[in-house]
A protein has these predicted regions:
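Conserved, compact domain cores that house catalytic/ligand-binding motifs in diverse enzymes
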Residues: 102-176, 181
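Short, solvent-exposed loop/turn segments at secondary-structure junctions
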Residues: 150, 268-269
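Conserved beta-strand->loop/alpha-helix structural units within folded catalytic cores of enzymes
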Residues: 140-146, 178, 249-250, 261-264, ...
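Feature marks short, surface-exposed loop/turn motifs that line or immediately flank catalytic pockets
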Residues: 9, 19, 181, 235, ...
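Extended active-site neighborhood of metal-dependent phosphoesterases/phosphodiesterases
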Residues: 53, 62, 73-93, 131, ...
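Active-site metal-binding loops of divalent metal-dependent hydrolases
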Residues: 109-113, 144-147, 179-180, 231-232, ...
């Protein structure tokens, strides 16, 4: 649990299984305190954050000995006084034991950190959907660019922590660094405001193989394994440290589901073109072969300000991207339409994956006239993605800022599947309508 204040004082945290019975605590001596480096003497060895308002104190409390898959309530304090209003407590749910049969719901958003009305509407639409469906989130994935325009500490505070305060008080966020955060943060040294903002598992605290860095990591949720990569400022070549760790992590996992996420999309024709930009080309040609040999089911990215979703595909490493003989199922994947995509139970090499570009979380949207040839759905609307794991079925839904489900597909793992490549798959038509969507919505004046 991480929090900040602007004054000196004795930090405290209490937690428990009931909101009105926070009967456990951590000694203040065991709470890590970080101060902005500019507030410290030049030769200080004291823990620090790279930047922040003068007088900032960042507190990090690592809580151990908790029960798995259990909801806890917590409250933080200073000098014995609660920092939240009376009656308000935060919550967190611990991860289930890896391999446990456990349903899970995850929210995915990208390119959202603007602090504008569209970001707020996307967030509100998700929370309204949860209330309507009587669901709670098990996790929150952000695929980068959560702090426009330069990933400054002040932008993290205003455009991420304040904008998503309700959700962050009760849900763990698993982040990937975007190019805007990369302007003031470094993946090589794992320093800067991005790395101050999050505490990511570098020593396999949440499953997987220890990466030794917060720049890339993995975690388990029941029978699903999630991998976060740095596509911005670390080497992407197969012999590099990140790719070598990825191979080791894939070899170890015994999960039934494999989800990977990072910022720069291997396939897009939105505000960016994956056939023309180095980071996108290299993630496609160098990283995707490793993931597909490990049986990846779903890849989540952002950067391109649009919603795009592919057909079931495998082996599309060439530049430019073509669809011939890399599409395994060219249907829509919708159980109410052409039917779900099918894969064998467990993780098998090269049985296909779906790519989602979810860069439509709150900044100006745009697209090219012709969609990527591997995409089944291309939508120029603000929104986010909901991932629902239930047994042998993964359901993905794109929820727009007005609360409408605009795209749905499923992957069902049942029976042994024989891979068949389609020589001439369905091709997306030219997209009619506007090529850009500005930062406003119906009825707004900005």
């Amino acid at each position: 649990v991480v929090w900040r204040t602007r004054a000196e004082g004795l930090p405290g945290i209490r937690f428990g299984l009931k909101a009105d019975a926070l009967d456990q605590s951590i000694s203040p001596a065991n709470i890590l305190i970080r101060r902005p480096v500019n507030d410290l003497p030049e030769d200080s060895k004291e823990p620090s954050i790279s930047s922040g308002p003068e007088g900032t104190r960042q507190f990090e409390a690592a809580i151990s000995g908790l029960k798995p898959d259990t909801l806890y309530y917590y409250s933080v304090s200073q000098n014995g006084e609660a920092l939240s209003p009376p009656g308000e407590t935060g919550t967190f749910r611990t991860l289930p034991v890896p391999g446990t049969a456990r349903d899970g719901l995850f929210w995915v958003v990208g390119d959202s950190g603007t602090g504008n009305r569209m970001q707020a509407e996307v967030h509100t639409a998700m929370r309204d959907w949860l209330k309507k469906e009587k669901r709670t989130l098990d996790g929150y994935l952000h695929v980068g660019d959560m702090a426009y325009g330069s990933g400054l500490d002040s932008e993290f505070q205003g455009y991420f922590f304040e904008s998503y305060a309700e959700t962050l008080r009760e849900t763990v966020c698993w982040p990937a660094m975007g190019n805007h955060e990369g302007r003031h943060s470094s993946g090589a040294t794992a320093t800067g405001p991005y790395y101050d903002a999050y505490v990511c598992p570098s020593t396999a605290q949440s499953g997987g193989v220890a990466s030794g860095t917060e720049a890339y990591y993995s975690f388990d949720f029941g029978k699903a394994h999630f991998i976060c990569l740095n596509s911005h400022d670390l080497p992407r070549d197969p012999g590099g440290a990140m790719a070598q760790w990825l191979k080791a992590d894939l070899e170890k996992t015994k999960a039934d589901w494999l989800v990977a996420f990072w910022h720069h999309p291997p396939y897009t024709k939105g505000s960016h073109d994956s056939d023309k930009e180095q980071q996108l080309i290299e993630m496609r040609s160098m990283i995707m072969p490793i993931l597909e040999s490990g049986g990846v089911d779903l890849v989540l990215t952002g950067h391109s300000h649009i919603y795009e979703r592919s057909m079931l595909m495998d082996g599309a490493y060439a530049t430019p991207t073509v669809s011939e003989n890399v599409i395994l199922n060219d249907g829509d994947g919708n159980p109410a339409g052409g039917g779900a995509y099918r894969k064998s139970p467990g993780l098998f090499p090269n049985e296909g994956n779906v790519q989602i570009v979810t860069g439509h979380g709150g900044t100006t949207l745009s697209r090219e006239d012709r969609p990527s040839p591997v995409m089944r759905s291309t939508i120029l609307e603000f929104g986010s993605v909901l991932l629902d794991f239930k047994g042998n079925t993964l359901t993905s839904q794109m929820l727009n800022s007005e609360g409408q489900i605009r795209d749905t597909f499923q992957i069902v793992k049942e029976g042994r599947v024989t891979v068949q490549r389609i020589a001439k798959p369905w091709q997306p038509p030219l997209v009619a309508g506007p090529r850009t969507m500005p930062l406003r919505s119906k009825g707004s004046g900005n």
